[in-house]
Swiss-Prot record:
UniProt lineage: Eukaryota, Metazoa, Chordata, Craniata, Vertebrata
Residue stretches of biased makeup (Low complexity): 179-194
GO CC terms of this entry: cytoplasmic vesicle; endoplasmic reticulum lumen; extracellular space; Golgi apparatus; intracellular membrane-bounded organelle; transport vesicle
Modified residues (Phosphothreonine): 424
PTM info: Multiple peptides are derived from VGF, with activities in synaptic plasticity, antidepression, penile erection, autonomic activation, and increases in energy expenditure.
Protein name per UniProt: Neurosecretory protein VGF
Biased composition (Basic and acidic residues): 415-433, 577-599
Tissue occurrence: Central and peripheral nervous systems, synthesized exclusively in neuronal and neuroendocrine cells.
Signal peptide location: 1-22
Length: 615
């Protein structure tokens, strides 16, 4: 038996080396022979051939058993059918030797018949979708028949099937399967890309491959992993096969190599079937990608529109600011020109009269309001008050104009600019000095260069010619000289109080109140006052907004105190002020006039010291 085992091991190594070296890289065209009982009977009936003679047909059958299309390896084969074929290859009986196996012939024939019937039942039950797992045939496990079961012919058959599996899962075959799967996946990808680009809708935006489009679209929930096949569940990688116990403990190489061959078989089956669910994307996934692409496109357009609106708002703000600056400069120039002309027209006396008129109008308005005591004003008084207020505003505007002009001159006086002297300001000033009467010795001198430079810079900033600036300064100087040469103005006497438009006759004293009548009972206190006369009508006055006004009962005093309402005359001190009040008012007016003249003089001195400085 040891010699048989050694010869079987050597034969296994020789067949393995020859099979791996002589395996053709191409695709064989022969189909695997059908496994049936008729195919096994001649092998069982023949005599035991030599090791080389018996291995030749098995090797050729193993070489011809490669499938035609390696790209579709086990694509249409049921895992249960594949497991049954492998079990049949493992359980194939061997023919007993002629001289020494005569005493065990009936037992082997009975086992072979039982195995043949089991395999046929499995083959017929393969098309059924839910067939129970075939039961393993009962095999005796006595230590006596263990060594005898390991026959060389049985080992040869197991080695031939193992060699076929090794050839199927060689590195070159696995590489060809990967290339075929990649080519098929790429074909399906390009097909999906072409259909996606040619279909109407927002998919036209992505002119790229499906991979780039899928990279742009946010990832969705991953697909569930494929469920493990029945073959993988039934045939684990690490667990030994229950049908391999018939080889005995001595022959361990078929079990080891078969376990190693089944592991890449299940992995290859999963690897071949895995790319197709990934490449065949359902219509819902395409629709989801298109919706996500549309959302991305809308977000991009919204961002571009927001940036455009922001740029437009910035441009409009800059244009508005520039327009306001131009308008402000124009208004300043117009204000200076109009204010100076109005000030020249009014003069010092005109300003004083305007202030006096304003004060008188204000006093008249206050007196009229006090006389009327809340009554409506007359339209003429409103017009006079409006005119007085307008004149007061004009006078105040002229004063502010002079102050503003002085501030501008003060701001520009300190700037030193190295510019060439212009002849126009000096010539104009000489002519003005020639036309003036007399004049002091200072008027004959020319203006210093610093003053001329400040005038030029001021005219440039105010958008005014230098001649206009010089003329304004000359007018201020002439006014100052007239004020010095003019006699002092007398203080105006205090004006008499205006005569009242109407005088109220003194009212007679109110009559004595009538004796109190019998009051109504307390429970009738909430009712109207029945003791009032029916024809009693109250005239409109401060206590009655309109005639026959009835005040609420809850806010009235007792009936004894609310008989009649009399309008008492106002105290005479409010309408006819005394001499003390008139003197006090005249003193206030004189002080106000003095303050105004002092401010005007300070303004003129300020302008003189800033713009008319002499060397």
């Amino acid at each position: 038996m040891k010699a048989l085992r050694l010869s079987a091991s050597a034969l296994f190594c020789l067949l393995l080396i020859n099979g791996l070296g002589a395996a053709p890289p191409g695709r064989p065209e022969a189909q695997p022979p059908p496994l049936s009982s008729e195919h096994k009977e001649p092998v069982a009936g023949d005599a035991v051939p030599g090791p080389k003679d018996g291995s030749a047909p098995e090797v050729r059958g193993a070489r011809n058993s490669e499938p035609q299309d390696e790209g579709e390896l086990f694509q249409g084969v049921d895992p249960r059918a594949l497991a049954a074929v492998l079990l049949q290859a493992l359980d194939r009986p061997a023919s007993p030797p002629a001289p020494s196996g005569s005493q065990q012939g009936p037992e082997e024939e009975a086992a072979e018949a039982l195995l043949t019937e089991t395999v046929r039942s499995q083959t017929h039950s393969l098309p059924a979708p839910e067939s129970p797992e075939p039961a393993a045939p009962p095999r005796p496990q006595t230590p006596e028949n263990g060594p005898e079961a390991s026959d060389p012919s049985e080992e040869l058959e197991a080695l031939a099937s193992l060699l076929q599996e090794l050839r199927d899962f060689s590195p070159s075959s696995a590489k060809r399967q990967q290339e075929t799967a990649a080519a098929e996946t790429e074909t399906r990808t390009h097909t999906l890309t072409r259909v996606n680009l040619e279909s109407p809708g927002p998919e036209r935006v992505w002119r790229a491959s499906w991979g780039e489009f899928q990279a742009r679209v946010p990832e969705r929930a991953p697909l569930p992993p494929p469920a493990p096949s029945q073959f993988q569940a039934r045939m684990p990688d690490s667990g030994p096969l229950p049908e391999t116990h018939k080889f005995g403990e001595g022959v361990s190489s078929p079990k080891t190599h078969l376990g190693e061959a089944l592991a890449p078989l299940s992995k290859a089956y999963q690897g071949v079937a895995a790319p197709f669910p990934k490449a065949r994307r359902p219509e819902s996934a395409l629709l989801g990608g298109s919706e996500a692409g549309e959302r991305l496109l809308q977000q991009g357009l919204a961002q571009v529109e927001a940036g455009r609106r922001q740029a437009e708002a910035t441009r409009q703000a800059a244009a508005q600011e520039e327009r306001l600056a131009d308008l402000a400069s124009d208004l300043l120039l117009q204000y200076l020109l109009q204010g100076g002309a109005r000030q020249r027209g009014l003069g010092g006396r005109g300003l004083q009269e305007a202030a006096e008129e304003r004060e008188s109008a204000r006093e008249e308005e206050e007196a009229e309001q006090e006389r009327r005591g809340g009554e409506e004003r007359v339209g003429e008084e409103d017009e006079e008050a409006a005119e007085a207020e307008a004149e007061a505003e004009e006078a105040e505007r002229a004063r502010q104009n002079a102050l503003l002009f002085a501030e501008e001159e003060d701001g520009e006086a300190g700037a030193e600019d190295k510019r060439s002297q212009e002849e126009t300001p000096g010539h104009r000033r000489k002519e003005a000095e020639g036309t003036e009467e007399g004049g002091e010795e200072e008027d004959d001198e020319e203006m210093d260069p610093q003053t001329i430079d400040s005038l030029i810079e001021l005219s440039t900033k105010l958008h005014l010619p230098a001649d206009d600036v010089v003329s304004i300064i000359e007018e201020v100087e002439e006014k100052r000289k007239r004020k010095k040469n003019a006699p002092p103005e007398p203080v105006p006497p205090p004006r008499a109080a205006p005569a009242p438009t109407h005088v109220r006759s003194p009212q007679p004293p109110p009559p004595a109140p009538a004796p109190a009548r019998d009051e109504l009972p307390d429970w009738n206190e909430v009712l109207p006052p029945w003791d009032r006369e029916e024809d009693e009508v109250y005239p409109p006055g401060p206590y009655h907004p309109f005639p026959n006004y009835i005040r609420p009962r809850t806010l009235q005093p007792p009936s004894a105190l609310r008989r009649r309402h009399y309008h008492h005359a106002l105290p005479p001190s409010r309408h006819y002020p005394g001499r003390e009040a008139q003197a006090r008012r005249a003193q206030e007016e004189a002080e106000a006039e003095e303050r105004r003249l002092q401010e005007q003089e300070e303004l003129e001195n300020y302008i003189e010291h800033v713009l008319l400085r002499r060397p």
